């Protein structure tokens, strides 16, 4: 279900990879960052000493007084006491755990190596080490999953007493085991109506527990929104570092070489990128809408006009009025945003903002 760049760590040149990744990072001469996010991939698969090399290398030239958030992703099965000690002694101030589900049978089915007990152990250890900004990822609409199982997962997640959760419905990516099984008719996924019911239940329960549904898939207690992801949904620019990473800098969307050995050679030659795409103003405006409408707060029409020097009304007025009439969008002052129904139909609504 996950199409990130991934490799088995065994027999991989891990130390050499870290060295090259840090070389790529340093080539940008970055001194000030508001957010840094390590993961999409699992950095805690590294040994404690390798993790320390990575964290020190990334932060040694950074002005930490302006770094608001440093998130690291972790697998519940990987976080031992040594690795937590490394995190504690670094600039990391937010940890995101790939829980996915609390059901041991389902974890095995989706190829995860951790168990439910590891989730509780890891969160207790992180809290004891002083981490209060903890997030978990959960997946719903898993193969054969029932509404009762979703209810149980949500109750257990709320019981963890953490300030942030990301909940994603299972999306099948090409070239993954799940997609191959579905094509062979061997994957009993919940029907769309049940998936919608699951999503509505999740929103209602988490809001009742004091979480704000601030983006299609994300819920937080006040003040604990993911700053890194908000920057991304605001269509701000970001560097992507490492094998298979994507970035968006100076109006250029780029992607790095994926296979590790190709990436190592590319860094040695002085350019890790395999593709670069210069976005036109039309494409930038479309992205502003696609990404911004994922947020509960939506898109500011004033900010849009300042950024692009174009009339929002002239470009999108008619489309917005039509979506408002259908109950999928609403206008609040200078902002346009999705209704709850619109959020569930996210991509279908966003497609209306493709400019001819």
Task: Show the residue positions of the predicted features.
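A short, conserved structural fragment
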Residues: 324-334
């Amino acid at each position: 279900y996950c199409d990130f760049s991934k490799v088995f760590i065994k027999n991989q040149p891990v130390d050499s990879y870290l060295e090259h990744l840090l070389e790529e990072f340093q080539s940008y001469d970055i001194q000030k960052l508001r957010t840094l996010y390590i993961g999409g991939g699992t950095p805690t698969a590294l040994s404690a000493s390798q993790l320390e090399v990575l964290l020190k290398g990334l932060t040694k030239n950074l002005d930490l007084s302006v770094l608001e958030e440093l998130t690291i992703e972790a697998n519940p099965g990987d976080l031992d006491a040594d690795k937590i000690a490394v995190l504690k002694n670094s600039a990391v101030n937010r940890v995101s755990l790939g829980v996915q589900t609390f059901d041991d049978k389902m974890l095995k089915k989706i190829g995860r190596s951790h168990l439910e007990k590891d989730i509780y152990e890891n969160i207790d250890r992180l809290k004891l080490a002083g981490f209060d900004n903890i997030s978990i990822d959960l997946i719903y609409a898993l193969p054969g999953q029932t509404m009762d199982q979703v209810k149980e997962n949500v109750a257990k997640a709320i019981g963890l007493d953490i300030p942030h959760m990301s909940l994603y419905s299972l999306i099948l990516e090409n070239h993954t085991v799940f997609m191959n099984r579905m094509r062979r008719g061997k994957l009993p996924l919940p029907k769309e109506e049940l998936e919608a019911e699951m999503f509505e239940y999740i929103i209602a329960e988490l809001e009742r527990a004091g979480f704000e549904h601030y983006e299609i898939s994300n819920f937080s207690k006040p003040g604990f929104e993911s700053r890194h992801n908000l920057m991304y949904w605001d269509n701000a620019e970001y560097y992507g570092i490492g094998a298979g990473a994507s970035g968006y800098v100076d109006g250029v969307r780029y992607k790095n070489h994926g296979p590790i050995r190709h990436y190592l050679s590319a860094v040695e030659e002085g350019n890790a990128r395999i593709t670069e795409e210069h976005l036109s103003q039309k494409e930038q405006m479309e992205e502003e809408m696609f990404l911004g409408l994922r947020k509960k707060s939506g898109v500011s029409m004033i900010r849009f006009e300042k950024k692009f020097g174009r009339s929002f009304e002239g470009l999108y007025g008619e489309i917005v009025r039509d979506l408002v009439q259908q109950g999928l969008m609403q206008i609040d002052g200078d902002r346009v945003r999705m209704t709850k129904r619109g959020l569930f139909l996210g991509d279908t609504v966003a497609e209306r903002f493709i400019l001819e």
